[in-house]
Amino acid sequence: MEDQMKRKYFILNTVTVLTLAAAMNTSSIYANSTETSASVVPTTNTIVQTNDSNPTAKFVSESGQSVIGQVKPDNSAALTTVDTPHHISAPDALKTTRSSPVVESTSTKLTEETYKQKDGQDLANMVRSGQVTSEELVNMAYDIIAKENPSLNAVITTRRQEAIEEARKLKDTNQPFLGVPLLVKGLGHSIKGGETNNGLIYADGKISTFDSSYVKKYKDLGFIILGQTNFPEYGWRNITDSKLYGPTHNPWNLDHNAGGSSGGSAAAIASGMTPIASGSDAGGSIRIPSSWTGLVGLKPTRGLVSNEKPDSYSTAVHFPLTKSSRDAETLLTYLKKSDQTLVSVNDLKSLPIAYTLKSPMGTEVSQDAKNAIMDNVTFLRKQGFKVTEIDLPIDGRALMRDYSTLAIGMGGAFSTIEKDLKKHGFTKEDVDPITWAVHVIYQNSDKAELKKSIMEAQKHMDDYRKAMENLHKQFPIFLSPTTASLAPLNTDPYVTEEDKRAIYNMENLSQEERIALFNRQWEPMLRRTPFTQIANMTGLPAISIPTYLSESGLPIGTMLMAGANYDMVLIKFATFFEKYHGFNVKWQRIIDKEVKPSTGLIQPTPPLFKAHSSLVNLEENSQVTQVSISKKWMKSSVKNKPSVMAYQKALPKTGDTESSLSPALVVTLLLACFSFVTKRIRKVDCNVK
């Protein structure tokens, strides 16, 4: 009988312990899974953007009028209204107009964090399946623009009312990017009612009356155009800054520039405004900002994409920047001309790969850039690829002299610049030094000699192409840094003060001295980006991929080049890296202003905190949440740990109500359990007696 009592006591005690453990665990789950609704940023009529010396906000309303607002120290905007656009006559002048009516955000199915983490196809699939509407995506995007743009200065015009109306009317005709918000570059990608001034301060207020062919194509793919992004004057620079719009700040660190010339688009994607934004590339203008903001930047083969001729000597191509390789692949599939054929390769590992750590200009390459390449070389070798170090068969300085000659040939576009400056109350110092230099050299050139020089430069372009084609016969894929250093500070000069003064007074120089000065003024920029121009001068494809994060928390890209029409092969390599190595994309957090990254010349630690794809490819019924990083942590550990976005899986939710037990129910179960155990013990005691 005593043994029977012991067994019953043991059983009852076990049941009690298990019940208590289950109840405590349930209570803990309930406490940890309680969520608050994501706060929705109030929508505004204005998109505010800043300029270091003259903080202003500028955009175009539905009527086509320009809007600028002074940014107060607390980042709120003081806006006034005028009836018509007018030109800025002083650095601190304000210009505003009536803006579109406020449209309140109605998004309840998508949090800001989840939106920022999705790529274009994710969002299109959500629209197509009815999980969210295009209008909700558009409102979400505008809310984020209103929040992020005051510190970034990425967006220069918006069209909110029109975008919402287009989203409401959108029909599903199997478009690949159904209802996805898109921002387009303010240079060359005109939208009806948007600005079309090439970044020239004296052309401010000039409004486009039509959509460009590229914008029409993007609309055909299902995109909803939100507005235009910032760019440097005429796209000359590898940074984004102009006297008209000011600098675009880097989302990774606001003290640094986003790069150029498609810097506004890059900053918009990196900060989570839109998953895709359009760009153009005549010397690296897609790949450079992609390198400095952690994005995928494809420069297609010359003539491969619609509206471009394959047999021309144009250096410019047009293609969107993305944060995933699959978005780039889909875009290429739909933007490629029907008469063009892409090369296909079944086994990537069958392709020998070459790489270099040396600048074709003979300039310094930072340790960060070298480490990025060697990190990728090591990865490729471990994956079974054959990788060989070589020297580039091209003289980068000779190539840039030819590039300068082609730029001077554009001088005819500035024939009225002096008259236009005077008419609007500006001087030559109010345009970019390159613009003024091209104008003066062109006006003082012997046109027959200039034509001869241009033809000679084009012959050299053929030679450069043949040299690279010969290289690709042996090594189909060529690896190099996209940029030789990390993103520059916004205060870093893009031309020396001495050369700037000389350019604005170059009328007093001989033509030979002018050309020498023009070639020399590129130097500060080319030290940062000596690699990208080769693809433009040869017409061959290249892609920048974001596989490396420096010790200081700034990304730097790796560029892959290949032969003509190997564009899809390059994207397949990007996909391989994204899947097995990891990308630093998927929405990056904005680093605290007080963190000062290096300028790219320090020895970094291995990138242990990359946002590998395995961290973000979560189950459909899991929610991605951001792990906050405090300022204190940033200060103490930035030297050793890159400050990238971290992700964690939340518990699956089965609906709008919590599936966990409430604390009251847990207590009730505990009391019932104790009552049951007590009664059983008494009964056992009676039986024993």
Segment roles from a protein language model:
Residues 90-93, 323-344, 362-398, 411-425:
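Acidic-enriched catalytic cores of C-N bond-cleaving enzymes acting on peptides and small amides
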Residues 87-91, 108-277:
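Gly/Ser-rich catalytic/binding loops embedded in alpha/beta enzyme cores
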Residues 147, 220, 271, 276-359, ...:
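Structural helix-boundary/capping segments
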Residues 642, 647-653, 658-683:
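A cross-kingdom C-terminal cell-surface attachment/processing module
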Residues 107-112, 177-203, 411-469, 482-485, ...:
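Short helix-loop capping/hinge segments that flank enzyme active sites or metal/cofactor-binding pockets
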Residues 25-38, 657-658, 681:
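Sec-dependent signal peptide cleavage junction
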Residues 17, 29-31, 47-157, 383, ...:
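An N-terminal boundary/leader segment
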Residues 599-654:
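C-terminal low-complexity, Ser/Thr- and acidic/Pro-rich disordered "stalk" regions positioned immediately N-terminal
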